[in-house]
Amino acid sequence: MSDGGSPKRMFRGVDHVGIGVGDMDEALAFYGAVGFGDVLFDWTGDVPGTERFTGAGARNARIAMLANGGATPVGPARVKLVQVLDGDGPPPIPEGQAWGELGICEMCLHTRDVWKTHERLAGLPGGRSLMEPLSGAVVPTNVALDISYVSDPWGCKLEMIEWKGLWTSLPGEPRAEGVNHVAFGVKDMKASLDFYRRMGFEERLFESTDFFDPMAPWYDRPIPSQHMVMMMAGQGAAIEPCVLDPLGPDCRGEWGHLGAMEFAVGVTNLERAAAWLSEQGVEVHGQHTVDVGSGEWRYAYLTDPDGLYVSLVEPRY
């Protein structure tokens, strides 16, 4: 393939994070208040590609893609809300999930003024504080940050971060901007980094092997060690794979489960990106085009080293 199809040109970082919710109308109100008030599409139907996760037919769901009007280069990505409508409805958050177990464990929003934004989001109907704001710096880059956590009405962990040593937020009121990164638990850090490096996640912002003590109350078992690495692409949101020791429970859960459950890597051309990854030995499972009214939702699920719910997406909405 020519240089025009090289990973750095075709892949656009994390485009969105998928979050399972129990009631779409309530979720639209909550995330609209968070800052994701631009509804790019709101679609209901059988979701192509999910049949490979169920072993039967595709899941029926209502899906809304939301953008933040205050998105920035360090908070660029979107949120995809998913309400499973068939079967017994939305599957629960995987049992035993604290942070870093195998599966998607959080969505992080870049924020202007973590303290004031934390107070506002924790005070929203259904919102709850999980970690009070604090300041720190990451190693080995020594980039300063403010950080906190809240949860949505269904228990999804929402991290708020302001990378003070990386970016100066634009003027304005305290606010949550777009998605900065998605965090997920893996079994083998090297395998995951090698895999996602093919999609342009090549710049390391930090790497830590120390346990992040403010997370201790989330664990109902002996505290594990944490190996966390944040990798950035040239565009889009970043990824933060984590390996726990011991690994803890499998928290991948069913597709559409409550909380953060999947993410998508943006591409400029779905066919070319899928073909290039296939040449690299990555399993890409079909390519789907869904008419969502405002345009086309074009995507393809792929197999990552840990069987997480990950897709490519070419936004046309």
Regions found by a protein language model. Give the residues of each.
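Exposed loop/turn and edge beta-strand positions of beta-sandwich/beta-sheet ligand-binding modules
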Residues: 13, 59-60, 103, 144, ...
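Short, structured motif recognition centered on aromatic/hydrophobic residues
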Residues: 14, 18-21, 31, 76-82, ...
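A short, acidic/glycine-rich surface segment
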Residues: 47-52, 88-94, 165-169, 212-217, ...
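Ordered, small/hydrophobic-rich secondary-structure cores
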Residues: 37-39, 43-58, 62-140
